[in-house]
A protein has these predicted regions:
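ATP/NTP phosphate-donor binding region
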Residues: 1-61, 68, 72-77, 99, ...
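Catalytic core of DAGKc-family lipid kinases
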Residues: 8, 37, 77-190
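Glycine-rich beta-strand-to-loop/alpha-helix junction loops that act as flexible
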Residues: 11, 61-63, 86-88, 196
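Phosphate- and divalent-cation-binding pockets in alpha/beta enzyme and binding domains
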Residues: 69-70, 93-94, 139, 270-271
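Short hydrophobic-aromatic micro-motifs
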Residues: 125-135, 139, 186, 190-195, ...
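Gly/Ser/Thr-rich active-site loops/lids in small-molecule metabolic enzymes
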Residues: 148-158, 197, 202-230
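A generic structural signal for short beta-strands and their flanking turns/coil linkers
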Residues: 171-173, 188, 215-221, 257-259
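ATP/nucleoside-binding phosphotransfer catalytic cores, i.e., glycine-rich phosphate-binding loops
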Residues: 181, 213, 223-286
Length: 286
């Protein structure tokens, strides 16, 4: 018997390439009944999932930001309905973590939506699928948002932004990190990121040993610090292979279930790529 699939796709994902690539599903799910639904900025995930029938399956198509919005807007009871994920974003870090490569494979999202960590920023609590981060990566997202406001069609070069920040523009800070009640203090901090998976930021393997399927549901927090900016840039460039952890004095990783990160001056925070400005602390409960 043919199955019924409701294909939700974000046309803005993958630098707007998703609206064409989504129709690869015609071949992947051939001989099934497919109904394509375009997700606008005003799209009501909660109402949509409330109305999904027992014989229907949902395919969520987009990037990590699409998953982030989905898990935070849908009623908990509706997250048990059959939901699959088809990666069509520009970073696709969730897919990179659970599947390892970008191909035509559907991922069963139901396996990954339970026991997600919660982050509190400025009194607002959200789930996150990949990470929450203070520091230069949040600053990069802030700069990228400003570029989009001026030139919406211009591709964003995050690597270029990060290089300029590491060498010249980003101002280091002091940080206090509390992990399951134990307090740590760090100077010359560029980054303090708490992760559910290994990857974020379009392939940065920030915490190579983090397991999103950890039976205790622990998360990891990476503190990246350094006094000499050129050395910081050289070590930071190794984050895409995970080799940055070979510099333990600059890259410190803690693991736990309750994390609090505080900076001594306001900075941008990004949660699964969504930016919040003027933040001095965030807390995570796994």
């Amino acid at each position: 018997m043919n199955a019924k699939y409701l294909i939700l796709f974000n046309p803005q994902s993958g630098n707007k390439s998703a609206k064409e690539k989504v129709y690869q599903l015609d071949d992947i799910l051939a001989n099934n009944e497919l109904n394509y639904v375009e997700m606008t900025p005003e799209f009501d995930y909660k109402r949509f999932m409330n109305e999904v029938k027992a014989d229907e399956r949902v395919v969520l198509c987009g990037g990590d930001g699409t998953i982030h919005r989905f898990i935070n807007e849908v009623d908990e009871a509706d997250l048990s309905k059959p939901v699959f994920y088809f990666p069509l974003g520009s970073g696709n870090d969730f897919n990179r973590d659970v599947h390892g490569k970008l191909d035509n494979t559907l991922i069963n999202l139901n396996n990954y939506m339970n026991n997600l960590p919660l982050v509190n920023v400025k009194g607002k609590t959200k789930k996150f699928i990949n990470n929450v981060s203070f520091g230069i990566d949040g600053w990069c997202c802030e700069v990228a948002d400003k570029i989009r406001q001026k030139e919406s069609s211009k591709p964003i070069n995050y690597t270029s932004i990060a290089v300029k920040g590491a060498l010249f523009q980003y101002k280091k800070t002091n940080a206090t990190v509390i992990v399951d009640g134990k307090e740590y203090h760090y100077k010359d901090v560029f980054l303090a990121s708490t992760t559910k998976g290994r990857f974020y930021g379009g392939g940065m393997m920030a915490t190579p040993d983090q397991d999103r399927n950890d039976p205790e549901h622990k998360v990891s927090v990476l503190v990246f610090r350094g006094k000499i900016r050129l050395q910081v840039l050289l070590v930071f460039s190794k984050i895409f292979t995970g080799e940055h952890i070979k510099k333990p004095k600059m890259c410190i990783i803690h693991s736990g279930k309750e994390i609090k990160v505080s900076f001594d001056s306001p900075r941008a925070v990004q949660v699964d790529g969504e930016t919040e400005l003027g933040v001095t602390e965030y807390t995570v409960k796994a």
